[in-house]
A protein has these predicted regions:
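Eukaryotic scaffold/interaction segments
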Residues: 1-265
């Protein structure tokens, strides 16, 4: 690039002229353009459409740098584009996250996750919202199971565990597909699971109530699957029920019930 050659030393790259007369004005112009475009686009389109638009624009800028610009320009240009396309609209994106969760918009969730992961602290509000969403989903599932009467004495252990596992499996898949198993989302998910399994409409204020129902279900599985040929399948089922998502000491609990079937009246 001729703008970057030092006339006194052709082998030495000097970018002062390039930066002053091209790079800086180019980045300023790009920021101005995207500031106006993003505001107009959001005024006329949905947030989910904007996620696609921002994704496309960032990809185009990456391609432009690779094709036509000095590699030193990349970080400066992309960071400014991320600021104007994502950071400037982060509040709106965060505020739309819950509706995407409620409607199971997996692709849009992944797109929002990917975009917000590009800015500092962009994911933390999403993690908090996801944790609250998982807890509410499980609490609602158990409340529906118990019904309006609120009688927990006759609660079927299998139905209780199935309700927990259904919520767990659904949101576990969301963590791994939409959020790519990101550690912060995994931590939020684990925290939500530990809280809802110990505090819900079936347990009241006693976490022992939940472990008792799960123990009854484990005992039912043991009695139903007593054949040696089914031992591996049984251990898999029990391991899923008492996974570390639910119990910090699940390995010890699992070995205990496998070694000595519970006698639960």
């Amino acid at each position: 690039m001729s703008l970057g050659l030092d006339p006194n030393d052709p082998d030495e790259v000097c970018l002062d002229v390039y930066q002053e007369h091209f790079e800086t004005p180019f980045i300023v112009g790009t920021v101005q353009y995207y500031t106006q475009e993003s505001a107009l686009f959001l005024a006329e389109n949905s947030v989910t459409d904007y996620l696609k638009k921002a994704e496309d624009r960032l990809r185009e800028e990456e391609d432009r740098v690779q094709r036509s610009l000095c590699t030193n320009t990349r970080n400066k240009l992309i960071s400014q584009c991320e600021h104007v396309l994502i950071r400037e609209h982060a509040e709106l994106l965060w505020g739309s996250f819950k509706s995407l969760l409620d409607c199971d918009k997996e692709e849009d969730l992944h797109r929002m996750y990917t975009l917000l992961s590009r800015i500092p602290e962009g994911l933390e509000p999403l993690r908090r919202c996801f944790e609250a969403h998982v807890k509410q989903a499980s609490l609602s599932a158990i409340s529906r199971l118990i019904g309006q009467e609120g009688n927990t004495d006759s609660l079927d252990p299998k139905a209780y565990v199935d309700a927990l596992l259904e919520v767990h499996q659904k949101h576990f898949e969301t963590v791994n597909s939409s959020f790519k198993g990101e550690a912060g989302f995994e931590a939020s998910f684990d925290k939500a699971c530990r809280e809802f399994v110990n505090r819900n409409a079936a347990t009241g204020t006693s976490s022992a109530r939940s472990s008792g129902l799960i123990a009854k279900y484990a005992d039912m599985l043991l009695k139903k699957n007593s054949k040696v040929a089914e031992e591996d399948d049984l251990e898999s089922k029990l391991g899923h029920v008492v996974s570390t998502t639910f119990f910090p000491c699940s390995d010890r609990f699992l070995s205990t019930i496998l070694g000595d079937p519970l006698q639960v009246s």
